[in-house]
From Swiss-Prot:
Keyword Nucleotide-binding: no
Assigned keywords, A-Z: Developmental protein, Differentiation, DNA-binding, Homeobox, Neurogenesis, Nucleus, Repressor, Transcription, Transcription regulation
Tissue-by-tissue expression: Specifically expressed in all A-type motor neurons. The A-type motor neurons class includes 24 motor neurons; 9 DA, 3 SAB motor neurons that are generated in the embryo and 12 VAs arise after hatching in the first larval stage.
Residues annotated to bind DNA: 88-147
The keyword Flavoprotein belongs to this UniProt entry's keyword annotation: no
GO cellular component: axon; nucleus
Pfam families: Homeodomain
Entry's family note: Belongs to the paired homeobox family. Unc-4 subfamily.
Impact reported for residue 188 to D/S: In e26/e2307; unable to crawl backwards. Abolishes interaction with unc-37
Name of the protein this chain belongs to: Homeobox protein unc-4
Compositionally skewed regions (Basic and acidic residues) per UniProt: 155-164
Amino acid sequence: MIGALHACVDAEPKIINDIWADFWKSQINSVLLNPSDGSETYLASDNGKSTSSREQSTSPDDDNLLMNEDDGIALEDDNDTGESAAKRRRTRTNFSGWQLEELESAFEASHYPDVFMREALAMRLDLLESRVQVWFQNRRAKWRKREQNRNGSSEIKKDDGEQMETKALPTFPFSIDSILAVSRVPRGRRPNAKYPRVQACKNLSPFMIPLFPITQPGGNVIREKSPPLPTQQSQIVATNALTTVAELLKSV
């Protein structure tokens, strides 16, 4: 009996070790055969340290499935890009003359029509409300650009006018002295040196101003009314004297 017990005790560790060995082999084989579950196997090394490794391998069938899925995604992307390009590509609306006249009159009434006004115009002109809205946006942009150009040109003209006003020549009262004071006469030369007639006319009395025009260096011609000639005055004085003498003789 004792020998049989010893034999059973000695056999138990071997059976347990065999069971554990079979269990671990099955686990390792299951992990190696099914790597998609993402499990990690820890293998004991000779020095007693554990290392982790992830096995990644795919079968040809899995590769084909992945390729087909990628192709499907690429086809869907192509369809999306085609639809977006079709949305971005809008047809240009050609307005008739009557439609443009109606739109222009509505724009003169209001630059920013509300939704109800746009819908009424669209129904009246047989257009889409979005087309009417786009036309008003473009018309407002054109109007703003025209106003900016107009304001810029008016400012330029105003600046030019101010510059011309500042550059205007000073005005002088009409007289011989003021004309001679203008810087047209060369410096360092007296007027009587080159223009003796002008100086002589300045020295004359008002009753002795000649009838000929006075010409200045710049070509300006001055004409003044001349008083009665001295001969006419002497004749008047002589006639008056004769009449007085005749009256005196009659009285005597």
